[in-house]
């Protein structure tokens, strides 16, 4: 995995050995941050990477100017790898081994951007959206990004879809709370 932009552009990160982790493709990462850049100033903003897996989205966020990174994953090996990669870059962040939905039920921090990329064959994206709207974790004018398999049904009740993109077998949705 290689960071595609910002301060740490072209820096290589250690990839997870486990096949269950699917790092977001570089062209998708570039698109995400180009779209975000057109909508918000990254300075003094917090990026929450739910279902962090490889953590590449959070590292891209810090590289491109976000001030704070929170990465949540329930796999201890993934969290260990995230901490190693953060250390190699000299990045401070919160790397938490915890269930993402439980984290959303009792958030410790307010955030500006939430990236949701759960395992594709689950309903975790919809469940996460329910928790976000119910528990007030997102700052005013915050943005949620969901990466999901193409044709996956997402319930946008309570949200406004501000942008939708398709990249082969995956869709990206950019949302705000209505």
What are these language model-derived features?
Residues 1-178:
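Class I S-adenosyl-L-methionine-dependent methyltransferase catalytic core
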């Amino acid at each position: 995995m290689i960071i595609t932009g910002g301060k740490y552009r072209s820096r290589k990160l250690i990839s997870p050995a486990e096949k269950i982790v699917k790092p977001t493709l570089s062209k998708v990462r570039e698109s995400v941050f180009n779209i975000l850049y057109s909508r918000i100033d990254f300075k003094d903003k917090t990026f929450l990477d739910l279902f962090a897996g490889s953590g590449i989205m959070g590292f891209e966020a810090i590289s491109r100017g976000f001030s704070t990174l929170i990465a949540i994953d329930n796999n201890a090996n993934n969290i260990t790898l995230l901490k190693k990669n953060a250390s190699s870059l000299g990045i401070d962040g919160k790397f938490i081994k915890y269930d993402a939905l439980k984290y959303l039920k009792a958030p410790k921090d307010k955030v500006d951007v939430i990236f949701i990329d759960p395992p594709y064959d689950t309903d975790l994206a919809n469940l996460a959206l329910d928790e976000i709207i119910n528990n007030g974790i997102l700052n005013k004018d915050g943005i949620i990004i969901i990466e999901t398999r193409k044709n996956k049904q997402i319930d946008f009740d309570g949200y406004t879809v501000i942008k939708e993109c398709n990249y082969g077998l995956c869709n990206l949705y950019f949302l705000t709370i209505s």
